[in-house]
Amino acid sequence: MKPMLKDFSNLLLVVLCDYVLGEAEYLLLREPGHVALSNDTVYVDFQYFDGANGTLRNVSVLLLEANTNQTVTTKYLLTNQSQGTLKFECFYFKEAGDYWFTMTPEATDNSTPFPWWEKSAFLKVEWPVFHVDLNRSAKAAEGTFQVGLFTSQPLCPFPVDKPNIVVDVIFTNSLPEARRNSRQPLEIRTSKRTELAQGQWVEFGCAPLGPEAYVTVVLKLLGRDSVITSTGPIDLAQKFGYKLVMVPELTCESGVEVTVLPPPCTFVQGVVTVFKEAPRYPGKRTIHLAENSLPLGERRTIFNCTLFDMGKNKYCFDFGISSRSHFSAKEECMLIQRNTETWGLWQPWSQCSATCGDGVRERRRVCLTSFPSSPVCPGMSLEASLCSLEECAAFQPSSPSPLQPQGPVKSNNIVTVTGISLCLFIIIATVLITLWRRFGRPAKCSTPARHNSIHSPSFRKNSDEENICELSEQRGSFSDGGDGPTGSPGDTGIPLTYRRSGPVPPEDDASGSESFQSNAQKIIPPLFSYRLAQQQLKEMKKKGLTETTKVYHVSQSPLTDTAIDAAPSAPLDLESPEEAAANKFRIKSPFPEQPAVSAGERPPSRLDLNVTQASCAISPSQTLIRKSQARHVGSRGGPSERSHARNAHFRRTASFHEARQARPFRERSMSTLTPRQAPAYSSRTRTCEQAEDRFRPQSRGAHLFPEKLEHFQEASGTRGPLNPLPKSYTLGQPLRKPDLGDHQAGLVAGIERTEPHRARRGPSPSHKSVSRKQSSPISPKDNYQRVSSLSPSQCRKDKCQSFPTHPEFAFYDNTSFGLTEAEQRMLDLPGYFGSNEEDETTSTLSVEKLVI
């Protein structure tokens, strides 16, 4: 207002001067003010006096910017025009500020000077008024907001060089008055360039500030520092507020969901409260039903239907910010209808529709509603499921029960009874098998071998129990006292010089095990006679008789049975009182009371003295010791209790029943052959050995010298000194019989090799044949295995039932014996057992010490 008064006063002053002086010069504006960027035009009136002499002058009007003193534009007046109006267009005024209009005359004739004068006018230009507005963006872009720029002033249509404006947005998290008491505020600035328009929306992205956000908008002209307009800081929460989004009316089934829509660039954090709208009574307070807190960033919450009353009622929701208790969102109300229709609890399952196989069971629930005529509970009131009981084929009742069958109970009873029955069956079977093994199984007896020997009518060669029942547990001797001279193979040192035992092929194992029990029962009659002979021997001992005994080693070849020694034994010990008391039940012996001593036999030698300390002696024909004997050696632990006799010179004797007639017999040929018998024996030996040599390496020499014996003793690890060589082993005698030490070493190696095999397979009735197949590795030079091409049973079938006479089977010798038919049947043990071609597991029926 003051500038206008000043201009008006200046104008009056000019008019007065002109009137007084009679000559008026002035420059006058029609409008004292102007709006920049507007489409208004500025008009300037002028008047000047050219002088008394009428000299023409050039006059111009300049538009100057007062702040910078720069000329915006210049306009020239006509020479013959002393007064008039000049028009200045809108595009000259792009920026607000102070402008000057100046009129300056110029002389046309330089020769005539004139005084300088200048007229001017002042113009004030202002910015147009722009209104700034903020708005939410579309839902698809919740992280943005819009800035609106609007003006009511018409803008100048710039023909060229149209100016641009810049919109700056500043985000802060606090108000300026709150910054003094808090830490440094967060401030984020963003700008956008836009064209000059009377109204427009400019979209901006949000800056992450938090639950509180303030925005300041600044509008500038591009390239200029002047600010057209500035708005802010604007509280976005107060500007936009929080909105609760919900349907106006709903039927509550499980819950009511309320969504909070926060202001732009603001995160939700507060409490949603629900209350029932109270009647409009004075003094009536609003009842708050529940409050749900929303953590930072969470927008949705659900209220359970149990909070609302049955029927249709109006409920209102409100959102408040805990940090700004003075501010709350606009209250939103809605109608909520809650029906009474709801489901009750499920009833128990019904019984299965079938007693076996697949059935169906059902359960129901009831709809609880205030309108029983038309229940509208959502869901199913009936539920069915399959129930599977036991299969019909597995359990069928004998008669249908009138009562309702209890499927699960009966099924459990069947399982229980079945389990108990199975357990009882297993227990009974275990007890029966144990009793059968302990009492019902016969003794596992080996198949005895044939013996081609004949003895005196009063004595007959017997076998110890270990030869008959090797696989069974150790029992006492057949004698009453049980003190017979027994011993493990490692405890006896009898030089069995001439003995041959053919190995048995491996195919005899199966047949031998099958006929084992039947063969073991057939040995009972001979064993009865052996026991009777023991009783008669004790009667002779009671009378103080002495006897001449012969110790033989019996093998499958009777010719190679070896006489150990012949010595008059000491008078036998008298019986114990218990035995004397039982004499009346025994059969008297028919033997004479004088001792029978053979004149041709040598006295006891050192052989008998070191019997207990000599190593195990075995026939040369026996390549390996039997597995049962090896087992007895290990179980007895060195010299066994049964192996050592009470009297070192005790020998077992036997006799037949008193009713038996004495049959013709011949003296058995000793191992020391006469010159008359040597050629025939040697020929048979060579014939048999030729048949065996086909199955073993030709590495053994024809003669076994005494120095070889020492080597074998060292290789076999003997337990004691070996017996001296018999007389038949001389350097000049061409006999093919091996030495005792030869197979004594093989015995030790055989035990070491057969024991792991037996531990792996267990005891078998046919283990003898397996052990005989293995050779005794003494040295690489003398390692061989004796294999017979034909078994003894095949020889019996092909040649003769008792003794074959073919030279190839020389181990069955008939030339030196004359046996009756009864004696041959008695001695033909394999034939007596009824062995066939498949049962070839015929082994010797004697231990290494047999006394006749």
Curated annotation (Swiss-Prot):
* UniProt-annotated glycosylation sites, renumbered to this chain: 39, 53, 58, 69, 80, 135, 304
Consequence recorded when altering residue 775 to P = In ANIB12; uncertain significance; loss of function in endothelial cell-matrix adhesion; decreased interaction with TLN1
Q: Which UniProt keywords apply?
A: Cell junction, Disease variant, Disulfide bond, Endosome, Glycoprotein, Membrane, Phosphoprotein, Secreted, Signal, Transmembrane, Transmembrane helix
Q: Which GO terms describe its biological process?
A: focal adhesion assembly
Q: Which residues cross the membrane?
A: 414-434
Q: Known Gene3D superfamilies for this protein?
A: Thrombospondin type-1 (TSP1) repeat
GO molecular function of the protein, one example? extracellular matrix binding
Intrachain S-S bonds:
352-387, 356-392, 367-377
Coiled coil segments of this chain: none
Q: Where is this region: Disordered?
A: 444-517, 624-799
| Residue ranges that the UniProt entry lists as topological domain Cytoplasmic | 435-852
Which regions are flagged for Basic and acidic residues bias?
655-669, 686-696
- Cell wall biogenesis/degradation is among the record's keywords: no
- Impact noted for substituting residue 460 to W: In ANIB12; uncertain significance; decreased function in endothelial cell-matrix adhesion; decreased interaction with TLN1
What is the protein name given in its UniProt record? Thrombospondin type-1 domain-containing protein 1
